[in-house]
UniProtKB/Swiss-Prot annotation:
GO terms for cellular component: cytosol. It is found in: Cytoplasm. It holds the Pfam family FdhE_N. HAMAP family: FdeH (MF_00611). This is Protein FdhE homolog. InterPro entries: FdhE-like_sf (IPR024064), FdhE_C (IPR056796), FdhE_central (IPR056797), FdhE_N (IPR056774), Formate_DH_accessory (IPR006452). Keywords: Cytoplasm. It comes from Haemophilus influenzae (strain PittGG). GO terms for biological process: protein maturation. PANTHER family: PROTEIN FDHE (PTHR37689:SF1). Belongs to the FdhE family. GO terms for molecular function: ferric iron binding. It comes from the Bacteria.
């Protein structure tokens, strides 16, 4: 990985020099509040309003669980500077299963018949079964877990990883510009990228679908293969140009790009989910999505 998380001593060495941060860490409470509101706003008159509102319920359950059962201080010494919370090597705390139980309890009273059946399955699953499904998701074997269960398991895992990311040093530096497709904190995939305003005006940051961190990647470069050639920007129409798809003809992938200057309330997970018709258009053109939304998992293999 090409972005390094700095130790306390390294932070002091660079304290007097300013450069745009390579990694931005989320404010958990603010993130969930903004996301839930955005999902509910986008659900108005949307053809997929029911699912957007379901996603908002999940996010609000994450916020409620965060407030009721925050992650205790973790033993996070001797972590790697590169991807310190790597999903494949970091030993997670079993508290994530408590988070899953609390999220399910929050959603159950308003669940329809299909969602209620999924909740019942997860409630009856053994610890070993839950951990096995979590392992498959965290190693990106998404097609081995049914999408209805994956949404809930990922919501609990993400709540855990988001809080763990608050307990590591928050300074970072770019080592080089290669291999920036995966999150430098946990190694997971991006949801989308955001072109920011404010102190980071015009800079593009990719948003992690697990620990919710964001990392800088220069524009006019493929977020998947680093190619600078054969890049094109697409939108369904100019009115919806807030959310665009950047395609790469070299690796035939795409990832959405969002622009805060067009709407400061744009939110990567919510706006990505609400613009699913752009995904359909890109797939019809032969491009494969290079990121993953925590509310849209691939179908399970039969």
């Amino acid at each position: 990985m090409s972005i390094k998380i700095l130790s306390e001593s390294e932070i002091k060495q660079v304290a007097n020099s300013y450069q745009a941060p390579a990694v931005l860490f989320a404010n958990p409470k603010n993130l969930y509040q903004r996301r839930a509101k955005r999902l509910r706003d986008l659900a108005q008159n949307h053809p997929l309003s029911d699912y957007l509102l379901f996603a908002a319920d999940i996010v609000e359950s994450q916020l409620s669980t965060l407030e009721k059962n925050p992650l205790p201080p973790q033993q996070l010494e001797q972590l790697n500077a590169i991807e310190p919370l790597n999903t494949k090597t970091f030993k997670r705390d079993s508290i994530w299963r408590e988070y899953l139980t609390e999220i399910l309890d929050e959603i159950k009273p308003k669940a329809n018949e299909q969602i209620a059946a999924t909740i019942e399955f997860l409630e009856k699953a053994s610890f070993a079964e839950l951990e096995e499904m979590a392992n498959k998701l965290l190693t990106q074997e998404f097609n081995l877990v049914s999408s209805d269960k994956a949404v809930f398991i990922w919501a609990a895992l993400s709540l855990y990883w988001l809080q763990a990311a608050q307990q590591i040093p928050h300074n970072s530096q770019v080592e080089n510009t290669e291999n920036l497709h995966h999150c430098p904190v946990c190694g997971s995939l991006p949801v989308a990228s955001i072109v920011q305003i404010g102190t980071s005006q015009g800079l593009r940051y990719l948003h992690c679908n697990l620990c919710e961190s964001e990392w800088n990647l220069v524009r006019a470069q493929c977020t998947n293969c680093n190619s600078h050639d054969k890049l094109e920007i697409w939108s369904l129409n100019e009115e919806l140009a807030l959310v665009r798809a950047e395609t790469c003809g070299s690796c035939e992938s795409y990832l959405k790009m969002m622009f805060q200057e067009k709407d400061p309330y744009v939110e990567p997970v919510a706006d990505d989910l609400a613009s699913i018709f752009l995904d359909i258009e890109m797939e019809e053109k032969g491009f494969a999505r290079s990121g993953l939304n925590p509310f849209i998992f691939p179908a399970e293999e039969a």
